Amino acid sequence: MNHEASNAQIMRGPAVDDLLKQILLTNETTRNELSYRHNYERNPQVLRDFFDGDLYQQSLDEGKFSDADDCAVILFTDAFVKDKKGTHTFNMVHLVILNFDAKIRYHQKYHVRLAITPGPSKSSLDSFLLPILAELYFLETRGGDIPAINFLSRVAPHQSAYPCKYCVHRAVHPQSRRHGTYLCRTDGEMRTLEQYRHGGPGRGIFGPSIFAGLDIFKGPLTFQIEELHTISRGGGFLLYAMLTVDNSKTTKYYHKMDPDLEDYERETYPFFVDKRTMEEIGQQIEETRKYLPVTFEGSFLDMIKQTRGTRAVDYNDFMLYIVPTLIVSKIRTRAAQQAITKLVRGCSIALQRKLSVDDLNEMDACFQVFFRFASLR
C-alpha cells in the first residue's frame, strides 16, 4: 500500500435512492405532502419558490418532472469547525427535498444529512461528492430528476480577477490600492453553459464542473446563492465593518493618498461614525435585551463591543434593524445616509419570502442608489 492510499479517508453515508424510497413508500401522509411540487400553481408575476425560477421552468420545457412522483432535491454544503480555535475543519453535505411545501421543508425532519467530510484540514470535496453524484446521475437517468445542485461551480474565489459566477467581468483594485478587488459595473457578459462544461482558466473557471455530466446541468443557473452567506454573512458583515472603522484598527475603507505611503483621508470617509457614538449604540443594544421574548433562540449582544461568536443572523439583524434606527442618523451627510438606507432596504426586499415584479424593480433601484454613491467616492 502506498503512502497516498494509506492516508485515504473513507466516507460512509446513506444511499439517496434508499432514502427517497423510504419517504415515498412507507408513509402515506409524507407521500401526500410530497405532492406540493406537482400541484404548485405558478404566478409569472411573483417569485415564491424554487419552482418559479428559470432552472426549474427550463426543465419543465424539456419534458422533465412530468410524473407526479418525480422528486426535486437540492444539495447544500458548508464548512464548520468544532472548536473556537478552528483546528479541525469539516464540510457538511446536506440534501433538502423541494417537493415539500416551503412552509415546512426547512424543518429538520425534512432534511437529509448525506455526509460530513473528515478533518483535520479542509478536504477535497470532489472525491467525497463523486459517489453522491454518481447515484444522483443514476436516479436522474433511471428514475426521477433533480432541479438544482448548489455546489462547486469551479469559478475562481471572490478575490480573483473574474470572481462572479454569472458574468465575465474583470474586478479592479481601488484607487491607490494594490489589494482588494471590486466589480464596478453590472453589464458584464453572461457566462455560458459551455464555459462550465469545459472550463476556462483565462476567464475565471479553473476546470469543468463535476456536475456537468448531469442532464439537468444548466451552467450558472445550477449554482444557487442563498441568503445566509450572501446577504447576512456577506452584506451584513461588510456593512458592520464599514460603519465601525473607528472602533477597529483597519484602514482598508479609507481612501489612500499615495500607494507607497500610509496616508489616509479619514476625514472624508462618507460612512464615518466616531468610536464613542458607536459604543453608546452598543450599550443601547444591550439594554434592549430585557425586552426580548424568552421564546427567541440565541441572544442579541452588544456587537460593537464584542463580535466573537456573532452569527450570520446577528449581522442580518444589525443591518435590518440597528442600522436604520440607531446608526444612519449619526452619519455625516444626507447623501451617505440615503445610500446606506437604500442598501438596507434592498437587502430587506431580497430577504422576503415572496417577490413581485414591483419588488424586484424597487430592489434594483435601491442597490443602484448605493452603487452610484460608492462609485463617486
Predicted regions located by residue number:
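Short coil/turn segments at secondary-structure boundaries
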Residues: 86-90, 107-109, 126-130, 152-154, ...
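Acidic, metal-ligating active-site segments
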Residues: 55-59, 65-66, 71-119, 169, ...
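Secondary-structure capping and boundary motifs in well-ordered enzyme cores
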Residues: 65, 69, 156, 277, ...
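Domain-level detector for long, ordered catalytic/regulatory cores in large eukaryotic signaling
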Residues: 1-41, 138-309
